[in-house]
Amino acid sequence: MPPFRAVILFRHMEINVIVKPPFKKLVSTPFLKKIASKTLKAQAADPNSELGIVITGQEEIKDLNLKYRGLDEPTDVLSFYMLEENPENLTAADDFPTPPDENIHLGEVIISYPQAELQATAASHSVSHEIAFLLIHGVLHLLGYDHHEVVAEAVMKSHQDIAMKHIREILE
């Protein structure tokens, strides 16, 4: 009888990126994937996590903001999480195993490039820096962080600051 062999499947986080045509030459897909990946890993997200990133314009994000938040104005970033339950404690230590061929789709982060550009100018830093910040912010929302209350806002800001330090070399 042949010896028993264990097969270990190593998965990686799947990050899907769509950059709308007017912004394709302005934003690097590998840059976005690195930022998202480092943020997810720093938060100990499940290695089977999957997320989508969309870079779009003012009109599309304004339409989404109106449809889903009731605000008839553009915004910088929107996060749409896809999990049925609040993803607050979604980490690699979760008791429920995910089959090796299934990813946990956290959701979508949608960023307005023109809004990021405006905010970068106002803050006197690069558009890449602003996009990284907005992406981190969006990913943290998908992981259950929020900023509607003072304490929660402080916690989220702390995680954003830590993530920005982790990606500093990517921005240079």
UniProtKB/Swiss-Prot annotation:
Cofactor, free-text remark: Binds 1 zinc ion.
Example GO biological process: rRNA processing
EC number(s) stated in the UniProt entry for this protein: 3.1.-.-
GO molecular function: metalloendopeptidase activity; RNA endonuclease activity; zinc ion binding
Location relative to the cell: Cytoplasm
InterPro entries membership: MetalPrtase_cat_dom_sf_prd, YbeY, YbeY_CS
Sequence positions that bind Zn(2+): 137, 141, 147
Residue ranges that the Swiss-Prot or TrEMBL entry lists as coiled coil: none
Name assigned to this protein: Endoribonuclease YbeY
Annotated organism of origin: Dehalococcoides mccartyi (strain ATCC BAA-2266 / KCTC 15142 / 195) (Dehalococcoides ethenogenes (strain 195))
High-level lineage: Bacteria, Bacillati, Chloroflexota, Dehalococcoidia, Dehalococcoidales
Encoding gene per record: ybeY
